[in-house]
Structures are given as structure tokens and as C-alpha cells.
């Protein structure tokens, strides 16, 4: 059986990166919520 998690920087950035978040209304909500909370990092590394 193959491992379920295969890390890939590009794929990760495309799905949960800053630019990906800015593309959708929901993503913008996520960013604004994290700004409101005072998060040091708006996106997960």
C-alpha cells in the first residue's frame, strides 16, 4: 500500500498558498479571519 501523504512544495502552494487563497471568496475569508486574529503568518508553511 502506498503512503497517503506525499509532500510536494508546488502542489501544496497551489492548493493552500497565498495566491490560491486570494482566488476564492472562501479563501479571502480565511485570510481576513487570520488577519483579524492577529496571526503572524497568514498561510501555513
Swiss-Prot record:
Keyword Oxidoreductase: no
Gene3D superfamilies associated with the record: 1.10.287.3980
Record GO terms (molecular function): structural constituent of ribosome
Cysteine disulfide links: none
GO biological process: translation
Record keywords: Ribonucleoprotein, Ribosomal protein
Keyword flag Protein biosynthesis: no
Region called Disordered, residue ranges: 23-45
GO cellular component: ribonucleoprotein complex; ribosome
Source taxon at top rank: Bacteria
Ranges of Basic residues composition bias in the record: 31-45
Classification via PANTHER family: LARGE RIBOSOMAL SUBUNIT PROTEIN BL34M, MITOCHONDRIAL RIBOSOMAL PROTEIN 34 FAMILY MEMBER
HAMAP family found in the cross-reference section: Ribosomal_bL34 (MF_00391)
Family, similarity comment: Belongs to the bacterial ribosomal protein bL34 family.
Protein name: Large ribosomal subunit protein bL34
Gene from which this protein is expressed: rpmH
